[in-house]
């Protein structure tokens, strides 16, 4: 039996590094349309774009997407998802997958994977994905979020800092990956149950979340388990900078 889940794609017009990001053209389409099309290729029963901007609503309706206008004052993307789930009237046990609106090359198969992982791990309130880190510079890049899990695949913590800190290895050489340390980069895709989203909003931000600017730390702070699996297909580059945009344009326009 196929798994029933809803994909929500948050799309905000304001971006400090790349203004107007969701509507930037790539191969003749706005970026958010590419994300929507990839999500539609997954097993999701419904794909919804959530935005706080009327121009994005208009653009999304033009290419046939279901789109909802949300409040503009949400603390995080997860808070926005909670509003969408309420607008859609989803049941507390329904599964919602958050697919970032700046991932025009997101593999549909990992959207299915993260939804299935949550369904298969009832002890977890959230499921998410990671991939191995192979380049030493990625460990020290604050834009690459690192995750460490326990032996059961449950997250111990996430950080923008090098995590774990290989004290002896880094004291000698930071240009090589420490031997025997499985560094992993977090992939910013989440599956939630709607009931959890309601709790998440009620808690409000915690100091650790605000310090790292990582909303998933709010869940860990409140004792929620996060299941982390290695993605079965590595995602291509997301779009955070003008350089990322040009790279994706070259890939899709080739």
UniProtKB/Swiss-Prot annotation:
GO terms for biological process: CMP-keto-3-deoxy-D-manno-octulosonic acid biosynthetic process; lipopolysaccharide biosynthetic process. It is an enzyme of class 2 (transferase). It holds the Pfam family CTP_transf_3. One of its GO terms (cellular component) is cytosol. It catalyses: 3-deoxy-alpha-D-manno-oct-2-ulosonate + CTP = CMP-3-deoxy-beta-D-manno-octulosonate + diphosphate. It is found in: Cytoplasm. One of its GO terms (molecular function) is 3-deoxy-manno-octulosonate cytidylyltransferase activity. Its EC number is 2.7.7.38. Pathway: Nucleotide-sugar biosynthesis; CMP-3-deoxy-D-manno-octulosonate biosynthesis; CMP-3-deoxy-D-manno-octulosonate from 3-deoxy-D-manno-octulosonate and CTP: step 1/1; Bacterial outer membrane biogenesis; lipopolysaccharide biosynthesis. InterPro entries: Cytidylyl_trans, KdsB, Nucleotide-diphossugar_trans. The keyword Plastid does not apply. Keywords: Cytoplasm, Lipopolysaccharide biosynthesis, Nucleotidyltransferase, Transferase. Activates KDO (a required 8-carbon sugar) for incorporation into bacterial lipopolysaccharide in Gram-negative bacteria. Belongs to the KdsB family. This is 3-deoxy-manno-octulosonate cytidylyltransferase. The gene is kdsB.
């Amino acid at each position: 039996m196929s798994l029933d889940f809803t994909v929500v794609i948050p799309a905000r017009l304001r971006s400090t590094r790349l203004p107007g990001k969701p509507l930037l053209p790539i191969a003749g389409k706005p970026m958010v349309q590419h994300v929507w099309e990839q999500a539609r290729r997954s097993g999701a029963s419904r794909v919804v774009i959530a935005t706080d901007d009327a121009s994005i609503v208009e653009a999304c309706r033009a290419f046939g997407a279901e789109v909802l206008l949300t409040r503009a004052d949400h603390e995080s993307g997860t808070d926005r998802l909670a509003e969408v789930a309420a607008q859609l009237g989803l049941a507390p046990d329904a599964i919602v997958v958050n697919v970032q609106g700046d991932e025009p090359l997101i593999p549909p198969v990992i959207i299915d994977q993260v939804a299935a992982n949550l369904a298969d791990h009832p002890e977890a309130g959230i499921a998410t994905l990671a991939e191995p880190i192979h380049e030493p510079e990625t460990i020290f890049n604050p834009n690459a979020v690192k995750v460490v899990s326990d032996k059961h695949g449950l997250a111990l913590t996430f950080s923008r800092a090098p995590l774990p800190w290989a004290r002896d290895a880094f004291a000698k050489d930071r240009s090589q990956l420490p031997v025997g340390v499985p560094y992993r980069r977090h992939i910013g895709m989440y599956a939630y149950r709607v009931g959890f989203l309601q709790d998440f909003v009620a808690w409000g931000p915690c100091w650790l979340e605000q310090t790292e600017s990582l909303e998933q730390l709010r869940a860990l702070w409140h004792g929620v388990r996060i299941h982390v699996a290695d993605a079965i297909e590595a995602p291509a580059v997301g779009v955070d900078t003008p350089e990322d945009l040009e790279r994706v344009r070259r890939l899709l326009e080739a």
